[in-house]
Amino acid sequence: MSFFGFGPAAELDIALTDGESRRRAEHKTEDGKKEKYFLFYDGETVSGRVTVNLRNPGKRLEHQGLKIEFIGQIELYYDRGNHHEFVSLVKDLARPGEISQSQSFDFEFTHVEKPYESYTGQNVKLRYFLRATLSRRLNDVVKEMDIVVHTLSTYPELNSSIKMEVGIEDCLHIEFEYNKSKYHLKDVIVGKIYFLLVRIKIKHMEIDIIKRETTGTGPNVYHENDTIAKYEIMDGAPVRGESIPIRLFLAGYELTPTMRDINKKFSVRYYLNLVLIDEEERRYFKQQEIVLWRKGDIVRKSMSHQAAIASQRFEGTSHPETRPQHSGAAAVEQEHE
């Protein structure tokens, strides 16, 4: 606010050099809404222009300098106000002086390191943003622009299937199998459940995808479980020897890549939870962790050299055993013949 309370004497605007052509990505905000932001990858250059728009053109505006920052930070909601910055770059755009008319200043942050994926969770937020600051003697004029960063991964070198036998002695014995342990965000989970022994009356069976967010360290560790999806496998009583196929499409759910010990502040892990409910409403369940990763999209011409190389890894050939399966439940069975 200005000295007389009539609002700031100037406004700042940030525009990206490739703003008209750059892809946007949806990202969840703190209030749960989805908004679109400019999408960047690790290693890409961030460039643009900061414009100082005077509220009263012709009237001189004194300032103590203009700067632009590129910031990556983590905010833990239980520790509001204490931001942990893991990327902090700054460029001075104008020295202290006077401005008498609206003026624009170009900036460029070359091949910027963006090591983590943007994330908004239950107890933590990881964000990247540009912040322009026009320093003034009384109150600074500040403008921020958020961007979204996606981290790309290569095909896992090892991606073994998951096969387990679980049960209750002399009551229930089942074998479940998933075709892989690592899935990209638009993958399909293919598997089967085989009933070896059934002496209790099962009336319902489902698979849940559970996201577990862990924040903090030491005594200040918080766990937040969120059921992302519920997939009904069967509704009715199974019999011994029955085999039930599983085919769960991940593309329809709001998922992120698995994140482990991000900047020693938080982790995000995913689990498949097999749930059985008997006629007396007793619940039996077995959890199995899976790894989620983001598959690269088609390389955009405007990407920097580093980001292009990272994305091209996806488009090249992969080992036969790591290539995604497309043959349905039969692929699972063949792996264990």
UniProtKB/Swiss-Prot annotation:
The protein, known as: Vacuolar protein sorting-associated protein 26B-A
Subunit structure: Component of the heterotrimeric retromer cargo-selective complex (CSC) which is believed to associate with variable sorting nexins to form functionally distinct retromer complex variants.
UniProt record similarity statement: Belongs to the VPS26 family.
Single GO cellular component term: endosome membrane
Region (Disordered): 313-337
A Pfam entry, by short name: Vps26
Coiled coil: none
UniProt topology in membrane: Peripheral membrane protein
Subcellular location: Cytoplasm; Endosome membrane; Early endosome
One GO BP annotation of this record: intracellular protein transport
Function: Acts as a component of the retromer cargo-selective complex (CSC). The CSC is believed to be the core functional component of retromer or respective retromer complex variants acting to prevent missorting of selected transmembrane cargo proteins into the lysosomal degradation pathway. Retromer mediates retrograde transport of cargo proteins from endosomes to the trans-Golgi network (TGN).
This protein's UniProt keywords: Cytoplasm, Endosome, Membrane, Protein transport, Transport
InterPro entries with a match to the protein in the record: Arrestin-like_C, Vps26-related
